[in-house]
């Protein structure tokens, strides 16, 4: 039996398309903060890279952000900074 060693680097073929989904309470600072975090590690975001949706009751806002990921280190850094942000409830 052959064992295949899969690492996070082999699961992705960098650079690659990658979607980040972020959910947080709807407030004025949420969008600015999310964009600022993602743009630390990527080029400036263009409006066509972002999809925004309000929750059914309007209390939450979700963002789907499309980026071209260059490495696993980049993805881990974005994910960690978003998780550390007090305005963000979930990161997928």
Swiss-Prot record:
May I ask which residue range the UniProt record assigns to the signal sequence?
none
Which InterPro entries does the UniProt record give?
Answer: UPF0250_YbeD-like (IPR007454), YbeD-like_sf (IPR027471)
Q: Name one GO cellular component term.
A: cytosol
Q: Pfam families this protein is in?
A: DUF493 (PF04359)
Cite the HAMAP family for this sequence. Answer: UPF0250 (MF_00659)
Family note: Belongs to the UPF0250 family.
Query: What's the name of the protein?
Result: UPF0250 protein Rmag_0541
Please give the organism: Ruthia magnifica subsp. Calyptogena magnifica
């Amino acid at each position: 039996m052959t064992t295949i060693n899969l690492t996070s680097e082999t699961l992705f073929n960098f650079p690659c398309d990658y979607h980040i989904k972020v959910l947080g309470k709807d407030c004025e600072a949420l969008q600015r903060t999310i964009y600022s975090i993602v743009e630390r590690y990527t080029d400036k975001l263009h409006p066509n890279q972002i999809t925004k949706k309000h929750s059914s009751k309007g209390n939450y806002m979700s963002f789907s952000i499309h980026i071209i990921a260059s490495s696993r280190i980049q993805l881990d850094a974005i994910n960690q900074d978003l998780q550390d942000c007090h305005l963000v409830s979930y990161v997928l």
